[in-house]
Structures are given as structure tokens and as C-alpha cells.
């Protein structure tokens, strides 16, 4: 599993002109599921992302997690994160999980985040989405489960 996480002041996702998920301050998580991912990868990433101390404390140091701040998490599926662009001019997506497996693990990740007591919103799996965000920092990380 590969995730791009961005600290945001706010973020939303729109499908067919309708907002399907939004948060205030917190994290936007773009999540890609690989073909060899398992339930343990979803749990690992959910724990890592929600515990990562990337929010500033009163001294201005990155010392607080999204759990500590009470922020929200917006999770958006993005299989293109698994693209291999090393050869040729067209990305290869053979490392990405097939849709049924990817959706199941995406939902497992979302559930694991919710189980940590965080306000959690999502996009629509497999849909064309418009994602809006106001970066905070900007602070952006790429995290992998393997």
C-alpha cells in the first residue's frame, strides 16, 4: 500500500458535481493498493498515518498527531500511485491490485482510521473525482506499508 498524505486546513472531494466527502483541518490521504497487499497493510498504514506527529505543538515543533489535534481524515482511492513509469512513455499499472481486492482493502483502511476515533470522510471508490484542498505548510509525505 502506498499513501500520499497532506496536512490540510480543509479538503473535499466531489463526484458528478456533488460533494461526497469533506473535512476541516486534518489529513488528506491518497491511497493506492498493491496486488500483494493484505489486511495487515491497511492496519499498519492506518496506525502509522494517524499516529504520525506532523502537526505543530505550541512551540512550533512537529510533535502532534491528527489524533492529538482532533483533526479529520479524508481518504481518496488512487490506483495511479502504483504506476511504474521507468520504461517507455505510458505508465504501467500491473502493480496495482485488481478492483475488487483494492476496494476491500481501501474500505479496511477507512474502517481502521474510523476505529481510532477520528472524523473520517471518503471519496467514491473507482469514480472520477475532483479533489480540493488547502495545504497547511505545505506538509506532504509518501508512506508505504512494505
UniProtKB/Swiss-Prot annotation:
InterPro entries: Daa-tRNA_deacyls_DTD, DTD-like_sf. GO terms for cellular component: cytoplasm. A motif (Gly-cisPro motif, important for rejection of L-amino acids) lies at residues 137-138. Its main location: cytoplasm. It is found in: Cytoplasm. GO terms for biological process: D-amino acid catabolic process. One of its GO terms (molecular function) is Gly-tRNA(Ala) deacylase activity. The keyword Secreted does not apply. Its EC number is 3.1.1.96. Keywords: Cytoplasm, Hydrolase, RNA-binding, tRNA-binding. Belongs to the DTD family. Homodimer. This is D-aminoacyl-tRNA deacylase.
Amino acid at each position: 500500500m502506498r499513501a500520499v498524505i497532506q496536512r490540510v486546513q480543509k479538503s473535499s472531494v466531489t463526484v458528478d458535481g456533488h460533494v461526497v466527502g469533506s473535512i476541516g483541518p486534518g489529513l488528506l490521504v491518497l491511497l493506492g493498493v498493491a496486488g500483494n497487499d493484505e489486511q495487515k497493510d491497511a492496519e499498519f498504514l492506518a496506525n502509522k498515518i494517524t499516529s504520525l506527529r506532523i502537526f505543530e505543538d505550541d512551540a512550533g515543533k512537529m510533535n502532534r498527531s491528527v489524533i492529538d489535534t482532533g483533526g479529520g481524515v479524508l481518504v481518496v482511492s488512487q490506483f495511479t500511485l502504483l504506476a511504474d513509469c521507468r520504461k517507455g512513455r505510458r505508465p504501467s499499472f500491473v502493480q496495482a491490485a485488481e478492483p475488487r481486492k483494492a476496494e476491500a482493502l481501501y474500505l479496511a483502511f477507512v474502517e481502521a482510521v474510523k476505529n481510532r476515533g477520528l472524523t473520517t470522510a471518503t471519496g467514491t471508490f473507482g469514480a472520477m473525482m475532483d479533489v480540493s484542498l488547502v495545504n497547511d505548510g505545505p506538509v506532504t509525505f509518501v508512506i508505504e506499508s512494505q
